[in-house]
Each structure stands twice: as C-alpha cells, then as structure tokens.
Amino acid sequence: MTVAGVHRIGLIFAMLVASATSLHAQRKVHTAYSVTPDVSVRLIASVGTVQVVGWEKDSVVVTGVVAAGSQVSLGTPGAGPTRGLKLFVESPTEQAVREGSLTVRVPRGARVWLKTGSSDVTVSEVTGGLDLNVVGGSITVHGSPRELNAESMDGAVTVDGSPSWMRVKTATGDIALRGGEDIGASTISGTIEARAGEVERAKLESTTGAIHFALALARGASVEMETHSGPIDVQLSRKSPPEIDAATVTGAIENLWSKIVPVAGREGRGMTLALGGGPLDGRIELRSFKGKITLRGM
C-alpha cells in the first residue's frame, strides 16, 4: 500500500472515531408536563437550535439532545396541570452548544419566554405571546401570535405572519416582516423588509440600514419610517392615496408614485414632499438625515 493510501485510511478512521465519540457524548432529553392551555413557559437554552411548536394538546413536551456534561433542569412533572414552567439547559463548551438541539411543544395559547446565546430559534403555530431574545442566532416566527417581542443582536429576524402587537430589534441582523396591527421594528445596520401584508400602525427605524416598505395600508393607518443614512424605499397603491409627509436634512427625495415634485428644504439643504390624501386613507411620515427617500407605485 502506498503512503498516500495509508494516510487516507488513517484520516477515515479518525473521522469515524470522532463521529462515534460525538454520538456517545450526547445525552437525550425527553420529558412531558400536563399544563393549562395558557401556560407560561420560561426557557433558557444553551444549544445550537431551538424549535417551539404550538399544538392542540394541553401539555408541554420537551425532546432533543444535549452534550454530555450539560446542566439540565427541566423540573418534575406534577400530578395536575401546571400554569408555569421554568426550563434550563447550559452546555459546558461552545462546541457542546452547537451539538445540542431542542424541540418544545406547547399549547397554542401558551406564553413563551425564551433566551439563548447563539441558537437559531424557530417558532410556529403559537397564538399566545412570544418573548424571544437571542445574541448571535436567528429568529424565525411562522404564524400570528397575539404578542411578539423578538430581539437578536447579530442574527436575522423573520416574521411570516401578522401578529396583533409586534416589537423587533436587531443590531446588525436583517428584519423581514409581513404586516400586523401594531408594528415596531428597529435596527442599527441591518435592513428592514416589510411587504406582502397589511398594517394598521407601524414605526420602522434604522441608522445605516435600508428600509423597504410595500405593505397595504388598513383604513386610517399610521406609518412612520426614519433613518440616519440608510435609504427608504416605499411602494404604495395608487387606488387609495394616503397623506404623505417626507423630509430629509441633506438626502434626496425621488417621487415615482405621483406627479408632485419634491422641493428643496430650508436654506437649500435636503428636500421635502407633502401629499394630501383622503381622511381615512392613512398617513405616512418619512424622515432621513442623509439617506435617499424613494416613493413608487406597487
């Protein structure tokens, strides 16, 4: 056998040993609780991925794997339905964090409070309340919870639904929304993408990231968008034109939505654009220090 062949066999053997060691080092998690339909679940999880799934049963079921040596505190199931649960998983190393994953099934009407470090979090079919806090991972929500508070420092936040009340915050992560009744979203350098839905009230803020808005306006809607240097791009239907108040300090305004031409601001700096609309067609306020504001039709 050649020297290259010997090295190849050695590499394969090492990979098999590493894989077997990793599997052996993992610990399975499985526990279930009888709970009330509106149970409050608090989970601190130091694992790679967390899935929260709403279902019709009045029970909470936690399954998954964690690395050996992890601290796991999942409590003891009681004799009757409980109104509150506190769950805790702490992995010993960063590598151990990546190896762990949890799936938590909760009643649809549950309120879930979740805090993780670098986990990627996915939530689906929960109609109660969600409070999600992640440092380095992403957050994805499918469905329309009653309340949603989601914060990720570096990861993206995607909301595929229309929560009644929503607040989303990132530092560098992008934000993607599909509408809702009362929306608040802010980022420092990430982008905010809001499209393919309807909104009643919204306040979107970014420092350097772009804002792209293409939501339909509910009757009497109120929308505010503000950036420092990030561009603002707004797409609107021409069928029910809202009142629009747009202004920049040094940035440009381009109106491709109507024939009204923006005018120079005070002292020749920046631009302003004021458009009248119907009393019930909504109002949009756009502000940027030096970012460009663009209006266009849908």
Name the predicted role of every residue range.
Residues 1-298:
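Intrinsically disordered, low-complexity terminal regions
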